[in-house]
């Protein structure tokens, strides 16, 4: 399990490597100690100590008749009244103060950089705006498990545009119903991008809830149709994920199994400067998809389905090509961008090797940040 000192050491190690760390924030519900409505003391150091009472629980919780509950019903918009634990009443001032103290403590005392809010269909998402306003995280994403892009857009607005959300619309409509089934028209304006909200989209193919954890489970229900052992399918999906605007989240089991291929895709995305608001030109029919994605330093061309057999586009370098997918990139003539945003005048042949970007100019070799290697 570890302790707070070991956690602090771990976070410091991540930060020393230039990484930022998110806390998994579960504030929709809380487990009890023994009876229906007895809770642990919440000690958040300088941000306060809280002694949760049964009156902090929503009045339509399963604990009805077991103890005295709060004044308000659950205000969740999608998955209200979580059955396995007590539901906090986020309209209750004490609960609000506790959650604000908790998020500030996580960020400023424990030194997490941001938050992944769990089970956000269980309480009104406007509360996320309140808690983020208090804590000011570097990054925030909410788990609102709905596959409708219009509803996700509405929830982002209700949260004051003060958080991103996992793009379940892309997961279900583009990956499950589109690429998995080679119905490539569903790649057009996929997910929140189709609503002009790609900057608020954390895009993903699978997560710990949707992933088939065993061969028997995979065969039995396909867990939304994905199979990590279908290499062509997984690489088609990841090529789309890592080419498109949004904040892509690579599923760790995919990374472990296909590290070499995914490294090349990530390097190409970085080289071209694809970002959460990159523009996309795209065309598709049922059997194929073609797109050009514009970055700050170049472009990516993505071909799926029968389009993968196209000839290499002029002026582009091949990143990776396989069964029903091909990915190419180019960069601007003036080289690449450094970490601090300065431009370098490194010209020459750009290529990807072992997942890393390099630039060769005569006898000189530079890395992807324009630093001379030899």
Residue ranges and their predicted role:
Residues 33-97, 159-174, 202-204, 212, ...:
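Glycan-binding loop/region signatures in secreted carbohydrate-active enzymes
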Residues 81, 234, 284, 342-344:
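Short solvent-exposed loop/turn micro-motifs enriched in small/polar/acidic residues
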Residues 1-82, 88, 123-142, 147:
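Acidic/aromatic-lined carbohydrate-recognition and catalytic surfaces
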Residues 61-68, 296, 331, 362:
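Extended, charge-rich alpha-helical regions
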Residues 3-4, 95-96, 230-231:
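A conditional alpha-helix N-cap/helix-loop micro-motif detector
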């Amino acid at each position: 399990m570890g302790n707070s000192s070991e956690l602090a050491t771990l976070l410091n190690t991540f930060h020393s490597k230039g990484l930022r760390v998110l806390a998994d924030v579960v504030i929709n519900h809380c487990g009890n100690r023994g009876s229906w409505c007895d809770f642990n003391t919440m000690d958040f150091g300088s941000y306060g100590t809280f002694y949760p009472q049964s009156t902090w629980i929503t009045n339509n919780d399963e604990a009805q008749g077991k103890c005295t509950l709060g004044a308000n019903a659950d205000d969740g918009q999608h998955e209200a009244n979580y059955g396995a634990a007590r539901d906090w009443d986020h309209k209750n001032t004490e609960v609000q103060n506790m959650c604000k103290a908790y998020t500030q403590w996580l960020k400023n005392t424990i030194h997490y950089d941001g938050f992944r809010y769990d089970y956000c269909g269980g309480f009104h998402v406007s509360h996320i705006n309140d808690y983020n306003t208090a804590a000011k995280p570097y990054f925030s994403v909410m788990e609102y498990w709905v596959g409708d892009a219009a509803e996700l857009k509405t929830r982002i607005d209700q949260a004051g545009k003060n958080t991103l959300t996992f793009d379940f619309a892309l997961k279900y409509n583009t990956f499950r119903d589109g690429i998995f089934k080679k119905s490539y028209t569903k790649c057009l304006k996929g997910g929140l991008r189709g609503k002009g909200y790609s900057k608020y989209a954390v895009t993903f193919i699978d997560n710990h809830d949707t992933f088939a954890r065993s061969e028997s489970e995979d065969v039995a229900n396909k867990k939304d149709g994905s199979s990590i052992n279908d290499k062509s399918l997984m690489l088609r999906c990841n090529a789309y994920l890592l080419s498109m605007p949004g904040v892509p989240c690579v599923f760790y089991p995919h990374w472990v199994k296909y590290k070499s291929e995914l490294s090349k895709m990530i390097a190409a995305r970085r080289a071209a400067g694809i970002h959460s608001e990159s523009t996309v030109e795209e065309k598709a029919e049922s059997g194929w998809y073609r797109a050009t994605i514009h970055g700050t330093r170049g472009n990516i061309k993505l071909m799926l389905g029968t389009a993968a057999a196209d000839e290499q586009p002029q002026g582009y370098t091949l990143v990776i090509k396989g069964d029903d997918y091909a990915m190419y990139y180019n960069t601007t003539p003036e080289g690449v961008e450094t970490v601090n945003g300065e431009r370098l005048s490194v010209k020459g042949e750009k290529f990807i090797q072992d997942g890393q970007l390099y630039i060769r100019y005569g006898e000189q070799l530079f890395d992807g940040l324009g630093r001379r290697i030899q």
